[in-house]
């Protein structure tokens, strides 16, 4: 049953109907559409469109329909309704007869779909935050277990300074914490109710929109009807957050892929998140991480698509806006699946502590310590930087680490070097000296882990 038709003398062509109908994807808004309809029925009582008895009858029927939807949401797809609003109204009329036709009084599908998608987005934010927090907890637990795993830190994919695997884990805790807080910010901005805005100019019935907003779990009603039915900022914002978080996940996945490579051999991924080759029997491929990395472009594509859809739309509602749903549904599903998979990857991750330490001892990652040592002896940093650079070249030519050079060799480049240089060139010294807040010193990392455990408890 179409919710329009009196204006038309011919039925819609089947080709147009197939092109126009959205039930195949907006069926996912069934629960929210029913929830909004119950709220609207209560608002109509207060403006004398419905009696209390009629409202109770409608609410009972809608709750029955809600139970049916929750038991088998896919059954909706067997219907030929235009969209989820048409489907809900049709099923309601089947249950209560002509009374069901009164529910849409003063309401447009424009404000109806606007409230549906906001209700859905609010629910998804809560679910996504729990998944993100769970990933953070797993990262913190992994960090706690790997505080002694010294490894190279990298810039430009070149060994730079020693860090610990725990410090690496806690870096991603911080990234995902920003994603979590962005979701909170987005939730607060979208927590306004557009229902009662009508098609664009507001409803002709003196509905108490603030009371309606509170009934539906919103903080307050939107302030402008024209904006209310045109607004899809919350979708763009969630797609933006999802895209940025997927970029974080992709970096996590890329690090894991590199660490898992035969050349690095820092970690071993569980058999449960890897696959083999149909030709090469020795292969153990990091498919979970590669798929996380690959799906990032898919989510970013949804953001780009939505921005392009919105950029040229005049006020107020346009059918183009129907294109908001498939992108947001797919992007948030993909994001949550990737967050959960990253959590699973961490579950049985093995860190090769001996190998990470061996790698940290190579690559002259203690060169900065030598430069700081010279500074402590009164050498200006810019000069010490140049001196250490020359020393590294010499060590490379001799096939030695800095810690393996003799004092006479050091003094070819600076006379201030003494026997105390060897202590500061050790990996432990490199870590211990980074004791400012946020640094890699074991004390600071332990503090960060303890603080995060308390925060995420």
Curated annotation (Swiss-Prot):
Its main location: cytoplasm. GO terms for molecular function: argininosuccinate lyase activity. GO terms for biological process: arginine biosynthetic process via ornithine; L-arginine biosynthetic process. Its EC number is 4.3.2.1. The keyword Membrane does not apply. InterPro entries: Arg_succ_lyase_C, Argininosuccinate_lyase, Fumarase/histidase_N, Fumarate_lyase_CS, Fumarate_lyase_fam, Fumarate_lyase_N, L-Aspartase-like. SUPFAM superfamilies: L-aspartase-like (SSF48557). The keyword Lyase applies. It catalyses: 2-(N(omega)-L-arginino)succinate = fumarate + L-arginine. Signal peptide: none annotated. Keywords: Amino-acid biosynthesis, Arginine biosynthesis, Cytoplasm, Lyase. It is found in: Cytoplasm. GO terms for cellular component: cytosol. It comes from the Bacteria. This is Argininosuccinate lyase. It comes from Haemophilus influenzae (strain PittEE).
